[in-house]
From Swiss-Prot:
Localization of this protein: Cytoplasm
Functional summary from the UniProt entry: Endonuclease that specifically degrades the RNA of RNA-DNA hybrids.
Highest classification ranks of the organism: Bacteria, Pseudomonadati, Pseudomonadota, Alphaproteobacteria, Hyphomicrobiales
Domain RNase H type-2: residue ranges: 61-250
Organism per entry: Parvibaculum lavamentivorans (strain DS-1 / DSM 13023 / NCIMB 13966)
Catalytic activity: Endonucleolytic cleavage to 5'-phosphomonoester
Enzyme Commission code: 3.1.26.4
GO terms for MF: manganese ion binding; RNA binding; RNA-DNA hybrid ribonuclease activity
Protein's name according to its UniProt entry: Ribonuclease HII
Entry-linked InterPro entries: RNase_HII, RNase_HII/HIII, RNase_HII/HIII_dom, RNaseH-like_sf, RNaseH_sf
Cofactor note: Manganese or magnesium. Binds 1 divalent metal ion per monomer in the absence of substrate. May bind a second metal ion after substrate binding.
Assigned GO CC terms: cytoplasm; ribonuclease H2 complex
Gene Ontology biological-process entries: DNA replication, removal of RNA primer; mismatch repair
Positions contributing to a divalent metal cation binding: 67-68, 158
Length: 269
């Protein structure tokens, strides 16, 4: 081994120094294995705040949050709520209604009734079947905003589209019920209101379990449909219900009217 290309090794042996020339190039020591970057811990989920409301000028301008409950069920109306919150008197723990249990939603609704302006809008089963669930939802939202004690300057709408016939400006907020407090409040109002309406409808349409599943597609609901057939508050335009209707029964259904819905709203509260 040529001088200058070896270093003392263990037991007096010599080992080659690096780099060494070879037929395929220069040999270099293997770099140490790269350390994996430490994985960042996922931040804890945050509660909705007033960021969107403040961006739209609150509290100087009236900003309402709007959300709905009941787009997916096979039975019952779709309910929307619009809420204007006093930024200085906001109940603690406001969140997307789906993340709260029924008792907590009821408590928050009671608090909101004392410190917020609330409007509720309904689209009946008949309207859902006539204009489809999407347009019925937009109609319910429009009615909710129109029923507020004061007309807002702008409405923050949960989702990716806004009702076209609102009397004020609007802004769609995807996932808004988990981001904006006024939308979270609206989701709670809409959910509790509709649940109470479905419990009242369960009394006049027994056997379906509406007070438990609120008209959603559950095994219990499908079992009742197969035994009893659709009733007056089932949505004929929804495929699972439509498949169970005979032509004669479809013509004879006595659907829930807007006037009946207003009575149910009063009973819900």
């Amino acid at each position: 081994m040529r001088p200058g290309f070896s270093v003392p090794g263990e037991s007096g042996r010599e080992r080659p120094a690096f780099p060494l020339p070879c037929a395929c190039g220069t040999l270099r020591p293997m770099p140490p294995p790269a350390k994996k970057p430490a994985q960042k811990k996922k931040p804890l989920p945050l509660l909705p705040d007033f960021r969107f409301e403040i961006e739209e000028g609150a509290p100087a301008r009236l900003v309402c949050g709007v959300d709905e409950a009941g787009r997916g069920p096979l039975a019952g109306p779709v309910v929307a709520a619009a809420v204007i919150i006093d930024l200085t008197r906001c109940p603690e723990g406001l969140n997307d209604s789906k993340k709260l249990d029924a008792a907590r939603r009821a408590d928050l609704l009671a608090e909101l009734a004392d410190c917020a302006e609330i409007g509720v809008g309904i689209a009946s089963v008949e309207e859902i079947d006539e204009i489809n669930i999407l347009h019925a939802t937009m109609l319910a939202m429009t009615r909710a905003v129109a029923s507020l004690p004061r007309a807002p300057h702008i409405a923050l709408i949960d989702g990716n589209r806004c009702p076209p016939s609102l009397a004020c400006a609007s802004r769609a907020v995807i996932g808004g019920d988990a981001l904006a407090r006024s939308i979270a409040a609206a989701s709670i109002v809409a959910k509790v209101t509709r649940d109470r309406m479905m419990a009242a409808l369960a009394e006049t349409h027994p056997g379906y379990g509406f007070e438990k599943h609120m008209g959603y597609s559950t095994p219990e609901h499908f079992d009742a449909l197969s035994r009893l057939g659709p009733c007056a508050i089932h949505r004929r335009s929804f495929a699972p219900v439509r498949k169970m209707l005979s032509p004669g029964l479809e013509e004879g259904l006595d659907l829930v009217s807007g006037e009946s819905v207003n009575l149910l709203i009063q009973k819900a509260y």
